[in-house]
Amino acid sequence: MAMTEQQKFKVLADQIKISNQLDAEILNSGELTRIDVSNKNRTWEFHITLPQFLAHEDYLLFINAIEQEFKDIANVTCRFTVTNGTNQDEHAIKYFGHCIDQTALSPKVKGQLKQKKLIMSGKVLKVMVSNDIERNHFDKACNGSLIKAFRNCGFDIDKIIFETNDNDQEQNLASLEAHIQEEDEQSARLATEKLEKMKAEKSKQQDNNESAVDKCQIGKPIQIENIKPIESIIEEEYKVAIEGVIFDINLKELKSGRHIVEIKVTDYTDSLVLKMFTRKNKDDLEHFKALSVGKWVRAQGRIEEDTFIRDLVMMMSDIEEIKKATKKDKAEEKRVEFHLHTAMSQMDGIPNIGAYVKQAADWGHPAIAVTDHNVVQAFPDAHAAAEKHGIKMIYGMEGMLVDDGVPIAYKPQDVVLKDATYVVFDVETTGLSNQYDKIIELAAVKVHNGEIIDKFERFSNPHERLSETIINLTHITDDMLVDAPEIEEVLTEFKEWVGDAIFVAHNASFDMGFIDTGYERLGFGPSTNGVIDTLELSRTINTEYGKHGLNFLAKKYGVELTQHHRAIYDTEATAYIFIKMVQQMKELGVLNHNEINKKLSNEDAYKRARPSHVTLIVQNQQGLKNLFKIVSASLVKYFYRTPRIPRSLLDEYREGLLVGTACDEGELFTAVMQKDQSQVEKIAKYYDFIEIQPPALYQDLIDRELIRDTETLHEIYQRLIHAGDTAGIPVIATGNAHYLFEHDGIARKILIASQPGNPLNRSTLPEAHFRTTDEMLNEFHFLGEEKAHEIVVKNTNELADRIERVVPIKDELYTPRMEGANEEIRELSYANARKLYGEDLPQIVIDRLEKELKSIIGNGFAVIYLISQRLVKKSLDDGYLVGSRGSVGSSFVATMTEITEVNPLPPHYICPNCKTSEFFNDGSVGSGFDLPDKTCETCGAPLIKEGQDIPFETFLGFKGDKVPDIDLNFSGEYQPNAHNYTKVLFGEDKVFRAGTIGTVAEKTAFGYVKGYLNDQGIHKRGAEIDRLVKGCTGVKRTTGQHPGGIIVVPDYMDIYDFTPIQYPADDQNSAWMTTHFDFHSIHDNVLKLDILGHDDPTMIRMLQDLSGIDPKTIPVDDKEVMQIFSTPESLGVTEDEILCKTGTFGVPEFGTGFVRQMLEDTKPTTFSELVQISGLSHGTDVWLGNAQELIKTGICDLSSVIGCRDDIMVYLMYAGLEPSMAFKIMESVRKGKGLTEEMIETMKENEVPDWYLDSCLKIKYMFPKAHAAAYVLMAVRIAYFKVHHPLYYYASYFTIRASDFDLITMIKDKTSIRNTVKDMYSRYMDLGKKEKDVLTVLEIMNEMAHRGYRMQPISLEKSQAFEFIIEGETLIPPFISVPGLGENVAKRIVEARDDGPFLSKEDLNKKAGLSQKIIEYLDELGSLPNLPDKAQLSIFDM
């Protein structure tokens, strides 16, 4: 169904990524009515109808976004029509400057015109000018273009009148005449230059008919005949010319002020680094900036050895950007690709789907399919790419099809196993295909009553030379077969010898295939004898075995196998193994041949089946959901080494799917190799289409001698085509693409080579690039022009036409339903507000609650709040505090529902008794915690201090319609409980972990590339290695799960409406299933709960357990606690003793070197200043080069600099700006977008100081104040214990937060510890990560020691497995703190100790499993006093 104009506008808004910026009414009602395209001029004009004017800043955002999106395709313009033009006069004033910029006036005159006053009267716009000359000049120069500019913006304007203000005429006359004269001179100069440039370009094109583009051009033109391949550059040369495509670029400014550009280019023979410095008085820098990745350049210069990178580089003298001819699809009718692998085909496909889609669109293909191996993880990106490039997307997958149960016994006979006669046989052949290869040896033994009673062994003459592979495998030579009988004679004799015995073979389907084919060619028809396959029998009755090959089984059963792959020896070994298997079957109750399959079948039978590749194509939306179900089942229920699709599963969910035969690993291709045509045609009827792939892709089958030669391959194609014709299903040519272009194939080779067990390593990888229609037609030219066109073009297009438009991703949010959520959130909010503020609520509380509840309930967000409230309440009830993250603390409703402890109201007092309150709304107080202590004037009770002054808008947006993202920090040890509680709330089938996709990282790719080059004995320069690394980076390597993300499916839908499911990293033992799609793909469609694990709540819980102090009762403004953020005095130590000017070692958020330096620079004394520090330390370009300089120069102090994003909105509102403008400025600054002219003007009008504007312009990212406040609250509570309960603090810190210990140093005296710390500081730049982690622990230990406490050695009698324990004024470390000692060993020591004391080191080793190295460490530590090496035998032990 065609999209409506409104839907087209939504798609456009999504594509250019501004949906979230637009007003909801505009987004929902806007229409994209048409696009005028001029291929000749490369222009697109979008015609858009809107219900109202866009705000000026939104208009500029829209124009910029659409121009950027399509800049590589066309020059874009927009024409807007506004249906409701109310307030046209107000908008005209704001748009005036933009419209002037669309005229051809000089910059100076434009600037002057922008200062003019506007008057709008109906459809006439009056511009007040200073004099008649101005009026005439402007009217002549820009009237028409200015009207056009306004109309393009949607204004209904008939004319523009320039009117004079007589009072100003004379004053401005002289100035204007000078401007006009300057403009005329400049226009003449520009016209002359343009004419000369056109002449030069025309002359150049006549002399050198190339497609060079005059963009980057430095130095002299480079003669094309001088170009040489990069691979030929092997030593220093004076002057060399090359051309290549840029794949990396780095532009740096030097201390001298000059710039150097370093680009890496490749011509796909090799790669090279090119360098060039800017020259004096030249515009080289602008040319350098014109270069970008993907552009082709021609360069000339000197090749020299770069001593820094130790490689050859080119120092360029000349460079020019060129336009390189790209690969084209020249066919009039284009094909459709139905078999294609992206980077989501694990360690196999190379490009992302977007690259394929763009290429297909560039070639003019009407549609393209994606069929990754076993997964559909490219679907979300495929949808976005198809929408962007205007091409039909076909969604599919190449899966692994298995029969539900592989029979052990064929053609069941009513024969008692112990009484039966068996013929155990084996064939040796010229190849693997019973249709195209021949038997060269047939050997058998006859078994009865558990004994071999007869033998049969014959060679047969194949009348062809044996390949080296077969000779090496079977040890049969041509000479041995020269005088051998014909196969007809051998088989006739064999059939008579067998009689009615039961056939037994190892992998019987192979051997019986040759026997039955031979029988049929002799006219006997297929064998009617019963069959038993010992391979499948072993897989069933020996499930504990990981292998079931004949070699392996012979060893397990104690049977001698003297010469494997000679028929008679294999046969005898199989016979003796089978005799023992019959006894096993008897013990399992299997007594008759016809009972084998029934009694030995099990639900894991799918694991025994050999998978065949199958292509599944989604035909409609129902098919998409069914494919999601199939994918999920294959990954969760039927995963065995690889995801498997039982045929019964496919049959159950086949509706809406088209089933294809896939590649040479497919069932039908195998059938052509192993079965006669009637059986092939029978199998073909199961499928909806047959795939045949280019002969080049099957070359490895010929190389591996699985197919005899090209002639045989062509015969296989004919049989496949005939099967399609007979079955009445289309035969289509598919490319099985794994990368875009031929030169990308090296990346796939590298990835495959990195997987030692991958079967693709056994042969040369075929060329699997994305082929054009021309290339595919050429591949199948041997079929004749008509047939080639039919399978390549006609059938692929007709099949594509049968497929409906499918959308794999939802376009809106689906939240769970909880009965009465709206009412409960409202009631809970007011109930807790009344508990805190009294029955007669202050108006400020009512106003804030109503404002928030209107947004929360009105937009359907109450259920999200209620879920979070339930999770937090459960954790609190279980004794664990929860810290909030992000901006949820901006919501007062979240505070009143106990989701967060942060109170966002302005600072205020509350009386806990009579509930009187006092609010400070003028910005004079940064945090309620900073208010001075005060008693209630009414009842005398000490007042509660609250409020962080955070606007609600920073959480749900200015309109309150942004989906709430509630992130919660649970204790790390409680997190699994919180996760599992979601199953209680919603049901196990409604909650899943948020899935992630792990791709090959750059460092990993580097290892792959180096390994491949070393294995191949190839040397490449560094630039080429970098290129190969880039080619391998980003390919899917594994899957995983978000550390805390839980996806909640609403009760009225199921998970398959959104995504398939799987286990993370395919770990079938995982406790949770995850979304198959990366959670970012469905983030806007389903609710994601961020239930994160954090150390702070865990530490608070341990401190509470040790001290009995409720952390919520800890005073937040304790003076001694506040003191440690500027001096260590309250800890009773000096700066010199602990080598630090603050006392914040180990305090969350304030213990790192970077933040400690901030504390030294700012010396905070209040809670609000600590919040500032937290915001400053988490922001980007907020502290360094910004607030730090403002404080140092004395322009402002810590409390007044911009620290958190919310500060901007609050500050600007207090300064007098409208809340909407204050919000816009905050959002623009926090996203690093700076300030618009309108914002700057508004801020200046309200006397915002210049330093504040400058600070805003520097910021790239800002931290939410609510997040900072929550972090600081936790930090202050932990700091309280550090100051007032030191041993509780240190025990908790070392237990929860520390991981790397140097116990040898920690048990020493304080002077020794300090010296070690000081020494490590002196070597800091040379320390590794582990050493730096040890240093962090030693800093805390040094502080602890100087406070008078010490660390004991490990105690065999007292140490716990994981927790530091307090003994007097000391701590005893746990066993886990011993370097190299793991969790299981730590537990085992405690368990062994509980069973009795350790008698010796030998006893310790034996009982606890301690290594000699660990025992020696404990000995050095002094933990094994008087423990002998071996126990002495006592008379009492006798």
Swiss-Prot record:
InterPro entries: DNA_pol3_alpha_NTPase_dom (IPR011708), DNA_pol3_finger (IPR040982), DNA_PolC-like_N_II (IPR024754), DNA_PolC-type_N_I (IPR028112), DnaE2/DnaE/PolC (IPR004805), DNAPol_HHH (IPR029460), DnaQ (IPR006054), Exonuclease_RNaseT/DNA_pol3 (IPR013520). GO terms for molecular function: 3'-5' exonuclease activity; DNA binding; DNA-directed DNA polymerase activity. It comes from the Bacteria. Residues 422-578 form the Exonuclease domain. It catalyses: DNA(n) + a 2'-deoxyribonucleoside 5'-triphosphate = DNA(n+1) + diphosphate. GO terms for biological process: DNA-templated DNA replication. SUPFAM superfamilies: PsbU/PolX domain-like, Ribonuclease H-like. The keyword Cytoplasm applies. Its EC number is 2.7.7.7. Disulfide bonds: none annotated. It is found in: Cytoplasm. The keyword Cytoplasm applies. Keywords: Cytoplasm, DNA replication, DNA-directed DNA polymerase, Exonuclease, Hydrolase, Nuclease, Nucleotidyltransferase, Transferase. It is an enzyme of class 2 (transferase). GO terms for cellular component: cytoplasm. Pfam families: DNA_pol3_a_NI, DNA_pol3_a_NII, DNA_pol3_alpha, DNA_pol3_finger, HHH_6, PHP, RNase_T. Required for replicative DNA synthesis. This DNA polymerase also exhibits 3' to 5' exonuclease activity. Belongs to the DNA polymerase type-C family. PolC subfamily. HAMAP family: DNApol_PolC. PANTHER family: DNA POLYMERASE III POLC-TYPE, DNA POLYMERASE III SUBUNIT ALPHA. This is DNA polymerase III PolC-type. The lineage of its organism: Bacteria, Bacillati, Bacillota, Bacilli, Bacillales.
